[in-house]
């Protein structure tokens, strides 16, 4: 296992504000371009937002293989009438390693055909044990993070699409990171609006502009509470600053990078307590 793994959180913006265009593959080419950008910057693992690019499994798998990177992509399973909101884990050889469905779809999703998945499982890879908890599963329920922590997860990915209150997203990511002491890669969609067709075929703005503020939190490389106290005293920005272990984007499209030392993560004792158990 490499001593440090570079993770890329891609805060992508849909190329069209028409919901139908996403279903028809309108974002696939842009997703591949963003993957290429992240790989050029040295990323070994790349995560897209929830439901992005939605379709294009063959193209994303081919890009992962060509670039030699792990990818977490929002690729749905099923038909438009009945489908799973799924994050698909793709290996650097282009093979699908796992599919993690959303287990607590919102009422709006259920009304539009989304089926609830069951359970969370860690994905064993040569860059560490990866886990995924999608959007509201992470923000409103503890089942996912707790299940992954019990399985020895090293890095938790939270692909999301916040249709409102995007400015609050970092607080959710930071809170879960502090609670469980694991790196959290929070990847929201870039701020955008989406239009749908109503019953009369007219285009209406279904979701006003919202999103952004992707946030990445990585624990400090310490192995005891005494070392944690010393880290607080000497860290960049001072004791009261989040500088050095919390990164966030604004509303626009962009990529956050985090270098994660998995061995150090496994030694981290948690914040203020000797265990990270809830």
Role assignments for model-derived ranges:
Residues 4-22, 99, 128-137, 157:
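Active-site-proximal beta-strand elements of phosphoester/diester hydrolases
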Residues 9, 87-89, 99, 120-122, ...:
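Conserved hydrophobic/aromatic beta-strand scaffold that supports enzyme active sites
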Residues 9, 71-73, 132, 186:
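Hydrophobic residues in well-ordered beta-strands that form the structural core
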Residues 19-102, 108, 162-183:
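Cys-nucleophile CN-hydrolase/nitrilase-fold catalytic domain and related Cys-dependent amidase chemistry
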Residues 28-31, 35-47, 113-189:
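Active-site beta-loop-alpha substructure in enzyme catalytic cores
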Residues 78-82, 113, 205-208:
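Short loop/turn motifs at secondary-structure junctions and domain boundaries
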Residues 92-93, 126, 219:
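Short, ordered coil/turn segments that flank beta-strands lining enzyme active or ligand-binding pockets
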Residues 122, 190-278:
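C-terminal beta-strand edge segments of enzyme domains
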């Amino acid at each position: 296992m490499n001593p440090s793994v570079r993770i890329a959180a891609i805060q992508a913006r849909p190329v069209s504000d028409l919901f139908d265009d996403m279903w028809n593959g309108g974002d696939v080419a842009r997703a591949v371009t963003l993957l290429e950008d992240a790989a050029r910057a040295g990323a070994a693992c790349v995560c897209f937002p929830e439901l992005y690019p939605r379709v294009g499994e063959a193209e994303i798998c081919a890009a992962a293989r060509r670039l030699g990177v792990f990818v977490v992509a929002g690729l749905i399973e099923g038909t438009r009438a009945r489908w799973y909101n799924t994050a698909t884990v793709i290996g650097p050889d282009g093979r699908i390693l796992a599919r993690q469905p959303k287990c607590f779809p919102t009422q709006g999703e259920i009304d539009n055909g989304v089926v609830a998945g069951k359970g969370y499982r860690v994905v064993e890879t040569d860059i560490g044990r990866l886990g995924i908890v999608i959007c509201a599963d992470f923000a409103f329920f503890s089942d996912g993070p707790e299940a992954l922590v019990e399985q020895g997860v090293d890095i938790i990915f939270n692909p999301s699409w916040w249709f409102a209150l995007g400015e609050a997203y970092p607080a959710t990511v930071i809170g879960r990171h502090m609670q469980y002491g694991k790196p959290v890669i929070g990847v929201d969609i870039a701020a955008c609006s989406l239009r749908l067709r109503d019953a009369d075929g007219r285009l209406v703005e279904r979701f006003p502009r919202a999103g952004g503020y992707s946030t990445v939190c990585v624990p400090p490389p310490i192995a005891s509470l005494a070392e944690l106290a010393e880290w607080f005293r000497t860290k960049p920005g001072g004791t009261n600053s989040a500088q050095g272990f919390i990164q966030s984007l604004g509303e626009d499209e962009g990529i956050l990078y985090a270098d994660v030392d998995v061995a150090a993560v496994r030694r981290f004792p948690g914040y203020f307590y000797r265990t990270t158990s809830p």
